[in-house]
């Protein structure tokens, strides 16, 4: 029989202090019954002697200290998981949001998860095709990797997220592919866009959606990514699926963390965020990966908006330390009408070399990637020079590089949000663009690949 406490001492923001408690443990799930019979949930955030600090998931509005009854349930916050979750939409706490019935779970899992033993990890080395050339060709995503997208306010990261979720697949694999999508603190319009896009394209059949709206309690945002990852771990490591987890927007998650930290009167760190922000983010990002002897995997694409487009802001800064690269969206390219506006030069996938090459993508992938990077960088330099000194100051070769840079942005990077390119199409397009330059300038590509692919590209022009 669970004890019922009527000793609520104080409620401040999303926190409740309960006095005279016994045998309560950290992270324990709490049920609060209000004077009108309404029930809410929370979790134990801190224990000090006979006092417990409870974090409320549904907010504290309407709670009367004298009439509230509190029960400590002796278990952490759990999610009931089953393969029937595929094709369903849930709120940030795992309750059905699509009008469908509740899931009959195969098992219930603690949403905090269990860290993967480093010795049991398998190295990520299998290519994931997203259908986006700027990612597949130049900043390749590898199965088991965590590759964030750094965006800015007003940039089309939602469209890019939906495109990747719709198009992503593992080549040459018999295993099922699933997408777990977590929208954190999103607007109603954006949430509806995701649901409609997934439903219209049929992608929802292989997807699980967790949607936390902007007007939902901020505390729910702290649980949402963990709910999504718990579902992903079950599908990956119990059902052998390749799972792609897309989370947007991590900035909203960090704001919720800051709100709780301020309510607890903790000493703030950089820009008011708690000093443990790095540790907390790592508990989310480090749940990606592959396990030796298991067929499935979890690949993460967390999306965050950089306040004032500042890469040195604590959220992108700390995310960059934990994850394996970043895809950066550019406001300058967006203004030019290039969609998706991926700035390939500062973007980076640290594991791209492991997922490309013969029998993975194609033998010439690494060489063409290096040549495209070098040529685009030189082309941008030539264009900047022409702005300062005038086009007449450029050599004939510089003019070709400037022409290449424009064609690269207009044809390779810009493909819209509905075009799904195979890796073969992406590599062939790269070769086609390289024909703009003289053969003598293609110094980063081996002669055998030049002979094999350059002639084909020139013939197809």
From Swiss-Prot:
Q: Which family does it belong to?
A: Belongs to the ATPase alpha/beta chains family.
Q: What does this protein do?
A: Produces ATP from ADP in the presence of a proton gradient across the membrane. The V-type beta chain is a regulatory subunit.
User: What molecular function does GO assign, one term?
Assistant: proton-transporting ATP synthase activity, rotational mechanism
Task: Look up and give the organism this protein is from.
Answer: Clostridium botulinum (strain 657 / Type Ba4)
Alphabetical list of InterPro entries matching this protein = ATP-synt_VA_C, ATPase_a/bsu_AS, ATPase_F1/V1/A1_a/bsu_N, ATPase_F1/V1/A1_a/bsu_nucl-bd, P-loop_NTPase, V-ATPase_su_B/beta
UniProt keyword annotation of Transport present = yes
From the Swiss-Prot or TrEMBL record, give the protein name.
V-type ATP synthase beta chain
| Keyword field | ATP synthesis, Hydrogen ion transport, Ion transport, Transport
The record's SUPFAM superfamilies line, in alphabetical order, gives:
C-terminal domain of alpha and beta subunits of F1 ATP synthase (SSF47917), P-loop containing nucleoside triphosphate hydrolases (SSF52540)
One example of a Gene Ontology biological process annotation: proton motive force-driven plasma membrane ATP synthesis
Does this UniProt record's set of keywords contain Amino-acid biosynthesis?
A: no
């Amino acid at each position: 029989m669970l004890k019922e406490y009527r000793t609520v001492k104080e409620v401040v923001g999303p926190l409740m202090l309960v006095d005279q408690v016994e045998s309560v443990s950290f992270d324990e799930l709490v049920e609060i019954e209000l004077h009108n019979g309404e029930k809410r949930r929370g979790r134990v955030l801190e224990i000090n002697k006979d006092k417990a600090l409870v974090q409320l998931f549904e907010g504290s509005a309407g709670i009367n200290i004298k009439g509230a009854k509190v029960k400590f349930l002796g278990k952490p916050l759990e999610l009931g998981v089953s393969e029937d979750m595929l094709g369903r939409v849930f709120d940030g706490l795992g309750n059905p949001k699509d009008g469908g019935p509740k899931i009959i779970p195969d098992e219930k899992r603690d949403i905090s998860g269990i860290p993967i033993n480093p010795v049991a990890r398998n190295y990520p080395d299998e290519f994931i095709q997203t259908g986006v050339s700027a990612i597949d060709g130049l900043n390749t995503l590898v199965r088991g990797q965590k590759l964030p997208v750094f965006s800015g306010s007003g940039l089309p990261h939602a469209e890019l997220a939906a495109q990747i979720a719709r198009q992503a697949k593992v080549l040459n694999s018999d295993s099922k592919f699933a997408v777990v999508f977590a929208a954190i603190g999103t607007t109603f319009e954006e949430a509806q866009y995701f649901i409609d896009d997934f439903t219209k394209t049929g992608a929802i059949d292989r997807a699980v959606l967790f949607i936390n709206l902007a007007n939902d309690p901020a505390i729910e945002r702290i649980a949402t990514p963990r709910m999504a990852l718990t579902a992903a771990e079950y599908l990956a490591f119990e059902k052998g699926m390749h799972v792609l987890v897309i989370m947007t927007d991590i900035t909203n998650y960090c704001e919720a963390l800051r709100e709780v930290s301020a309510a607890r009167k903790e000493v703030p760190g950089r820009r008011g965020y708690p000093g443990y922000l790095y540790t907390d983010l790592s508990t989310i990002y480090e749940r990606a990966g592959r396990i030796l002897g298991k067929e499935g995997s979890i690949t993460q694409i967390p999306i965050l908006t950089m306040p004032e487009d500042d890469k040195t802001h604590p959220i992108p800064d700390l995310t960059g330390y934990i994850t394996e690269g970043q895809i950066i969206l550019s406001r300058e390219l967006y203004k030019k009408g290039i969609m998706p506006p991926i700035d390939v030069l500062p973007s980076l996938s640290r594991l791209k070399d492991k997922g490309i090459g013969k029998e993975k993508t194609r033998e010439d992938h690494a060489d063409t990637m290096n040549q495209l990077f070098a040529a685009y960088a030189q082309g941008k330099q030539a264009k900047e020079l022409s702005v300062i000194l005038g086009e007449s100051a450029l050599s004939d070769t510089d003019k070709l590089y400037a022409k290449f840079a424009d064609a690269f942005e207009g044809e390779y990077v810009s493909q819209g949000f509905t075009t799904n390119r195979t890796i073969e199409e992406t590599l062939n397009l790269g070769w086609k663009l390289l024909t703009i330059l003289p053969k003598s300038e293609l110094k980063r590509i081996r002669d055998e690949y030049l002979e094999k692919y350059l002639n084909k590209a020139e013939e197809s022009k």
